[in-house]
């Protein structure tokens, strides 16, 4: 008889408009910090290209997302994917646009500035993007503590 206990993974979906920055950061941190207790994905309403500033600041944090692809939240919905948490990470995606996924335990909104909207020199934009990255990491750490 096999005495192994199978623990259900906590499934998390992060949603933003383009799936190019904030949702990608959050997904990467859940994958890194959540261990095998979590399964994370991210998607957007209008998938675009990964923001190069985000790729760079995540590389500084020793997380390589350069090969990540942006995905459509509507494709996930049509496929009938189930999530314990659906977390919107930009104000534009928190409203009516976000589909209601069946079986959601919690729907949460985290408001973070969009790195593509930052003004200033490249270094100033990089510093602002690092700040967003660090804020998202803290939010993910809190989520992991709460969910486990």
Please tell me what each predicted stretch does.
Residues 44, 90, 111-113:
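Residues at the C-termini of beta-strands that transition into short coil/loop
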Residues 1-77:
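Conserved active-site segments centered on acidic
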Residues 46, 79, 113-115:
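Short, solvent-exposed coil/turn elements at secondary-structure transition points
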Residues 95-148:
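Phosphate-binding/catalytic loops
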Residues 5-11, 78-89, 129:
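Cytosolic catalytic domains that perform sulfur/thiol-centered chemistry
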Residues 81-103:
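Mid-chain, well-packed structural core segment of small domains
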Residues 19, 58, 86-87, 136:
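Conserved small-residue
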């Amino acid at each position: 008889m096999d005495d192994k206990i199978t623990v259900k993974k906590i499934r998390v979906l992060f949603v933003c408009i383009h799936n190019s920055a904030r949702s990608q950061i959050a997904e990467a941190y859940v994958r890194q910090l959540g261990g095998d207790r979590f399964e994370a994905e991210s998607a957007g309403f209008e998938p675009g290209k990964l923001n190069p500033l985000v790729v760079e600041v995540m590389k500084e944090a020793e997380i390589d997302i350069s090969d990540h692809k942006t995905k459509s939240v509507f494709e996930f919905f049509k496929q009938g994917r189930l999530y314990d948490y659906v977390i919107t990470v930009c104000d534009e995606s928190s409203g009516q646009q976000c589909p209601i996924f069946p079986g959601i335990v919690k729907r949460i909104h985290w408001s973070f500035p969009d790195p593509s909207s930052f003004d200033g020199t490249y270094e100033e934009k990089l510093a602002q993007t690092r700040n967003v990255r660090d804020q998202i990491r803290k939010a993910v750490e809190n989520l992991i503590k709460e969910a486990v």
